[in-house]
Amino acid sequence: MSYACPILSTINICLPYLKDINMIDKRGETLLHKAVRYNKQSLVSLLLESGSDVNIRSNNGYTCIAIAINESRNIELLKMLLCHKPTLDCVIDSLREISNIVDNYYAIKQCIKYAMIIDDCTSSKIPESISQRYNDYIDLCNQELNEMKKIMVGGNTMFSLIFTDHGAKIIHRYANNPELREYYELKQNKIYVEAYDIISDAIVKHDRIHKTIESVDDNTYISNLPYTIKYKIFEQQ
């Protein structure tokens, strides 16, 4: 991998040998800050996968998220950072640092959308200038999330199945649940539309597990086990 910036090329070569991937320079910036600033998407991905902390603030209070919005103006970089689950404080601080709340409307909406998942009281923590301008969007986020929290699927809420680590591990088990199917088929969300992709993937996984179970030869040790046990065996694959 080659970069126009010599510093970044050196980082790429030395990365496997670094003792602390989150080391900071005299400006309080990490390698991740610099990779985001220089718009190096592949390097940002590598740093995140290697354990870079997305929550670290520089000496001037800048987060990587704020840099992605104000300097890089790169939505894909922003999405990568949000996928690595920054803290609510990090996101709120990043919103405070946004220099143009009009032109950066899409990036701001991405941050609000993520923050509302973490804490449904987020709206009270968002900078007033942003909360006033994006009030309708915040309300719609709340509406969709509250609806997910009301729907029970087995012993879980739709929200927990979609947005928690535990839910991600078990949602496929509920692929034929009538409440989940109805929610999926209605497709009423305008903001959290990724919920439908998650459910679709869960249905595909469930069907694959079921077909695998059906393909097991009769009169074998596994074939004689209860269906639920066989399901748990094959869902690990």
From Swiss-Prot:
The keyword RNA-binding does not apply. The lineage of its organism: Viruses, Varidnaviria, Bamfordvirae, Nucleocytoviricota, Pokkesviricetes. ANK repeats lie at residues 27-56, 60-90. This is Ankyrin repeat protein 14. It comes from Vaccinia virus (strain Western Reserve). Keywords: ANK repeat, Early protein, Repeat. May be involved in virus-host protein interaction through the ankyrin repeats. The keyword Protease does not apply. SMART domains: ANK (SM00248). Pfam families: Ank_2 (PF12796), PRANC (PF09372).
